[in-house]
UniProtKB/Swiss-Prot annotation:
Belongs to the paramyosin family. GO terms for cellular component: myofibril; myosin complex; myosin filament. InterPro entries: Myosin_tail, XRCC4-like_C. The lineage of its organism: Eukaryota, Metazoa, Ecdysozoa, Nematoda, Chromadorea. SUPFAM superfamilies: Myosin rod fragments. Homodimer. Its main location: cytoplasm. Paramyosin is a major structural component of many thick filaments isolated from invertebrate muscles. It comes from the Eukaryota. This is Paramyosin. It is found in: Cytoplasm, Myofibril. PANTHER family: CINGULIN-LIKE PROTEIN 1-RELATED, MYOSIN-6-LIKE. Keywords: Coiled coil, Cytoplasm, Disulfide bond, Motor protein, Muscle protein, Myosin, Thick filament. Residues 1-9, 834-848 are annotated as: Nonhelical region.
Amino acid sequence: AFGSMSVADLGSLTRLEDKIRLLQEDLESERELRNRIERERADLSVQLIALTDRLEDAEGTTDSQIESNRKREAELQKLRKLLEESQLENEDAMNVLRKKHQDACLDYAEQIEQLQKKNSKIDRERQRLQHEVIELTATIDQLQKDKHLAEKAAERFEAQTIELSNKVEDLNRHVNDLAQQRQRLQAENNDLLKEIHDQKVQLDNLQHVKYQLAQQLEEARRRLEDAERERSQLQAQLHQVQLELDSVRTALDEESAARAEAEHKLALANTEITQWKSKFDAEVALHHEEVEDLRKKMLQKQAEYEEQIEIMLQKISQLEKAKSRLQSEVEVLIVDLEKAQNTIAILERAKEQLEKTVNELKVRIDELTVELEAAQREARAALAELQKMKNLYEKAIEQKEALARENKKLQDDLHEAKEALADANRKLHELDLENARLAGEIRELQTALKESEAARRDAENRAQRALAELQQLRIEMERRLQEKEEEMEALRKNMQFEIDRLTAALADAEARMKAEISRLKKKYQAEIAELEMTVDNLNRANIEAQKTIKKQSEQLKILQASLEDTQRQLQQTLDQYALAQRKVSALSAELEECKVALDNAIRARKQAEIDLEEANARITDLVSINNNLTAIKNKLETELSTAQADLDEATKELHAADERANRALADAARAVEQLHEEQEHSMKIDALRKSLEEQVKQLQVQIQEAEAAALLGGKRVIAKLETRIRDLETALDEETRRHKETQGALRKKDRRIKEVQMQVDEEHKMFVMAQDTADRLLEKLNIQKWQLGEAESLTMANLQRVRRYQRELEDAEGRADQAESSLHLIRAKHRSSVVTGKNASASKIYVL
């Protein structure tokens, strides 16, 4: 457009320069014509002076010559008058020409001013149009860039949509796989929850068992300490018993030696008695029965003492057996205690591992709840974003309908503009034909004028030759001049008539052309204004479409961002799913470990129960032993009381025997020594009795201590068992309460899982709907891109048509200006031809 306007301005300037140059040429031609007329006038004056001289020279001729001279003078007077008239006419014509020239100059000056104004206006219009053209070119370049960018973006978006559709298909398949895996994981999760619940129950049981085992361990430790103390006491007692046993054995050895000695002495005494029997039969006869009684009693007492010694030896062997059995039991208890300590350490480690697993499971449950809440929030945000996208989609549909209406309106306007352009083209074609016809007529007139000028020149040449041959060919010249005058008059009249007709036709054509040009100019200006309005509307529509495209691109970016967010969320969910799988595998491994630990704990519990049963059996054995010991104690007490009674009786009898012995010693001197020996033997027996009494007392003390220890151990065991029973009852109540709470929590978790499953299904449906809406939006975006491309092509076509109309209008204006300039040239030439014709006629008249 800028190039076309600059070319139009240059064309108008060149046309103005051509007009000025033509006016200067016309002025120069008129000056030359005036100089030529003055020269011809000077030549005619010289010829007139020469003719007057010749007439003066010929005055002396004949009268005919005088008359001819008179006639010639009269003719000369006429010629002078004609010359003066022609001069006056020439002066009038010159004045008229000057006036016309001045008027023409003024007209040309006015036209130049108008043209300058038009030029300045055209310059301003040109500058404005240049600015508009620059802006339009910038906008067109921007539109082309935007179009190129939009095409690239559209291609990129198409590629992205294809990729996204592929990704969405993959995601759908993956979502289906995830749904299946989720269902499978849900079932596994339910199983794991059940197993976790069972593990929790077992863990609580194990904790309770651990607590009980800890209590049992404490009790076992206390019992072990008590057993160790008892063991140390028993060892001390055993050492004392061994010492006593050694002393008793030494005493028994001494007693056996004494018995052997006593038997030997008894044998000696028997021999002595048999020896002295004969001597003292009379003396002993009195005391024989008493001695027999005493011997029998002594034998009985000896037998009883031997029986008591055997009983004590049996008791000592039983005590040794009990000691060995207690030692073996203590060793077994130590081994069991070590086993219990090992099992307790294992159970403590298992408890710590289970506590760690429970804490990890709690942390994982908290993480899963947090992730579930985050997923719910993201789902709610996705629903809100989907609602926004629905609203934007509805707005885009409304904008699409508005654009469709505007496109339809623009298509109607373009159709009308096309029809108007077709009419304008048809009229321009007609004007071109009319201009061509007028140009042909102008060329014909120019040829006719050239022919007339050539004829005028020929006439002037002939007139000059006639003036040269005036004297010889006067009559012929008069006749020819008359003919020429008639021909010139007829030609002048014809030319004047033709010129008037042509000027009228030219004026009519000029008026029609100006009216048509003004009408076409107005029409074209109106059409250009309408087209500019349509272009502005199209630009606005294009800008709005660009805005809508930008909005839709932003929406697509938002959708792409949301899709990327959903992809990231899906990737996060996949990562979380993989983490959950790993966690599930770890939990399954930990569950297996927990199962193994639980089996170990169950086995340890069974072993502890077996140990408890064994401990109970041992307690019952100890109780039975205690009962046996109490029975033995009672029996020993009765035996001790009987032995004490026997000892009292023996002491009484011994006193009686002493008395009797004293009496017998008093009666028999030989019996004194025997009695003295018997007395010593009785003293030894008393010492043995005292030692046995001390041993019995020590055994009673030991039995009482053992009984007290057994009673204390039994009471402690019973108290511990009662506390354990109470603890087991409280633990059972707590476990039942926890079981109920865990069942309620499991029911809540099941409901929550069902709700989450429903939410996931709804989110999947919403995702499918969002994908469908995204596909529809992409299709609509492609349609709008195609419509935008068509609108841009239509705008480019309209701009090209407007530029073509502007060029055609400028060409029409140029042709109109050329026609005006050619018309002015024809008028100027017509004026110059008229003036030259008048001058030629005047010169011819002067020659005649």
